């Protein structure tokens, strides 16, 4: 189970803005991936979020990339991301999996 407060704090520290839909989609994806470590982004995660949001999986993926792009332009992204053990530009799957691991209650 994921600690949602920890997830919100981690994403805030990385510079994600609440005003972007992709930020919420990333949170939802991290929760899905924490519940099922074998969930695949294109087959499981994007379609599940798209159904809940009433949109297409492609738009979910694009919104997540846009939110990450905006966060990467914020001050402190590099340092905060490296603290999570990442490198310069994560894919959506890498980001969500790392957030799921970092914010898991069992950690």
Model-inferred region functions:
Residues 3-12, 20-24, 28-29, 36-107:
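Basic, alpha-helical nucleic-acid-binding regions used in initiation and control of genome expression
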């Amino acid at each position: 189970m994921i600690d949602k407060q920890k997830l919100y704090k981690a994403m805030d520290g990385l510079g994600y803005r609440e005003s972007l839909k992709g930020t919420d989609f990333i949170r939802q994806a991290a929760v899905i991936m924490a519940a099922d470590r074998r969930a695949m982004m294109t087959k499981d995660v994007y379609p599940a979020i798209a159904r809940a949001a009433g949109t297409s999986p492609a738009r979910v993926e694009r919104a997540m990339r846009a939110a990450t792009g905006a966060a990467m332009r914020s001050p402190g992204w590099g340092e905060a991301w490296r603290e999570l053990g990442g490198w310069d530009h994560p894919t959506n799957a890498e980001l969500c999996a790392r957030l799921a691991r970092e914010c898991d209650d069992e950690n």
